[in-house]
UniProtKB/Swiss-Prot annotation:
GO CC terms, sorted: cytoplasm; nuclear membrane; spindle pole body
Residues annotated as transmembrane: 311-327
Organism: Saccharomyces cerevisiae (strain YJM789) (Baker's yeast)
Alphabetical list of InterPro entries matching this protein: Mps2 (IPR031433)
Parts forming coiled coils: 157-269
Family indicated by similarity: Belongs to the MPS2 family.
Pfam families: MPS2 (PF17060)
Keyword tags: Coiled coil, Cytoplasm, Cytoskeleton, Membrane, Nucleus, Transmembrane, Transmembrane helix
One GO-annotated biological process of the protein: protein localization to spindle pole body
Subunit structure: Interacts with BBP1, MPS3, and SPC24.
Name used for this protein in its record: Monopolar spindle protein 2
Membrane topology: Single-pass membrane protein
Length: 387
């Protein structure tokens, strides 16, 4: 590995930026320019065709890092002995390794690369040594300084003014950074105070929580000891009062239900019996009246006349029964139906004897039906309540 070739390339690029008048450093804003000078050297070597190179040397990401560094640290002084560390922190690779890997088929920078690219021009240190040697030999005299041209003096004055401007900018930047540091320190102190306050509150809350937890545990232990004792008054009170009260409440509810059902059944039975008695008495009264009249009529008429009259009545009744439908059909054929047509009585309802006979059998049937239904209700009630 040729360290001399790398040093020559680095010294050449450094000398293009670091002029003897500015000192042994470059500013952060000059870092992209230094990288560009090194890339131009390798691009010229590739164009000449003397060497096979891997270009570009630096990726776009690395170039963005260089530009960001130059923008954020514009007037940061990069000394030559600190350059390797700063460069490695930016791209995570040393500059020497990047330049040596650029040559294809060679592990290091060829020694004749410097000669082919004409990089043997005197660097800053050679210029400084030459100036020192000439001063030691007595070549330069105060008279020469007096005879310097006004253009050189003006250029030196411009450089001095530029340096003064840079110094002022650096002072302003330093003042801004100091104020920023003071503000950060103030915020840090406030945050420390708030942190201490929150720590005290947290300790207080934690203490209260532990006290409440202990009190709750003691209370639970006391309750468990009370409930675990079978002879305790609490357990006795629950067994005697709560259970008996629940039984009483259920028994009262069943008693009320039974009383309500009994009253309802009694009311239904009383209503049916009263209706049956009223209807039966009315019909019986009508029947007795008719029977009395019929008996008086029979006793007043002789037996032979009664037999003839009975035969004649039966014959007449048969004739009327056969002719009556035709007469009714003829009489009511052209009548329009009215709303009261449904209320007209049947032909047997107009006869007192026939209506009494039919009503008697219907009443007997209804009474038997009601008796059976009431008996079924009583049986169901007895089965439900166990009576």
């Amino acid at each position: 590995m040729s360290n001399g070739a790398f040093d020559a390339i680095f010294e050449y690029a450094w000398g293009q930026i670091d002029k003897p008048i500015s000192g042994d450093f470059i500013y952060g804003k000059d870092l992209p320019k230094l990288i560009e000078i090194i890339e131009n050297i390798f691009q010229k070597a590739q164009k000449s065709g003397s060497y096979e190179l891997r270009l570009p040397l630096f990726s776009e990401i690395n170039k963005d890092l260089f530009r960001t560094f130059s923008n954020t640290k514009t007037f940061f002084k990069i000394h030559k002995e600190e350059f390797d560390d700063i460069f490695f922190n930016l791209v995570n690779h040393p500059l020497r390794e990047i330049l040596e890997n650029a040559f294809i088929g060679v592990d290091s920078i060829p020694s004749d690369f410097i000669v082919s690219m004409n990089l043997n021009s005197p660097s800053k240190f050679l210029v400084e040594n030459k100036s020192k040697n000439t001063e030691g030999a007595g070549i330069s005299t105060p008279r020469k300084k007096l005879t310097e041209s006004p253009i050189k003096l003006l250029s030196r004055n411009n450089i001095g003014k530029a340096l003064e401007v840079q110094v002022e900018e650096l002072k302003r930047e330093l003042t801004a950074k100091q104020s920023l540091l003071q503000e950060n320190e103030r915020q840090v102190s406030e945050l420390k105070i708030r942190l201490e306050t929150y720590q005290e509150k947290y300790a207080s809350i934690q203490q209260r929580f532990s006290d409440l937890q202990k009190a709750r545990q003691v209370e639970d232990n006391q309750n468990s000891s009370r409930t675990s004792d079978p002879g305790s008054p609490l357990v006795t009170g629950i067994d005697q009062k709560a259970i008996l009260e629940e039984f009483r409440r259920r028994l009262q509810r069943q008693t009320d239900t039974i009383s309500f059902l009994k009253d309802q059944i009694r009311r239904e039975r009383g209503l049916n019996c009263s209706n049956d008695k009223v209807s039966h008495s009315k019909r019986k009264h009508a029947t007795t009246d008719g029977d009395g009249t019929f008996k008086n009529f029979i006793s007043a008429v002789p037996s032979n006349i009664w037999v003839k009259a009975t035969i004649r009545i039966i014959v007449c009744f048969a004739l009327l029964a056969g002719v009556l439908p035709y007469i009714r059909k003829y009489v009511y054929a052209h009548d329009t139906p009215s709303q009261n047509s449904r209320l007209q009585l049947s032909w047997w309802e107009n006869s007192g004897i026939l209506s009494k006979i039919v009503w008697f059998f219907e009443d007997q049937t209804d009474l038997e039906t009601e008796y059976r239904s009431n008996a079924n209700v009583d049986d169901a009630y007895s089965r439900v309540f166990g009576i």
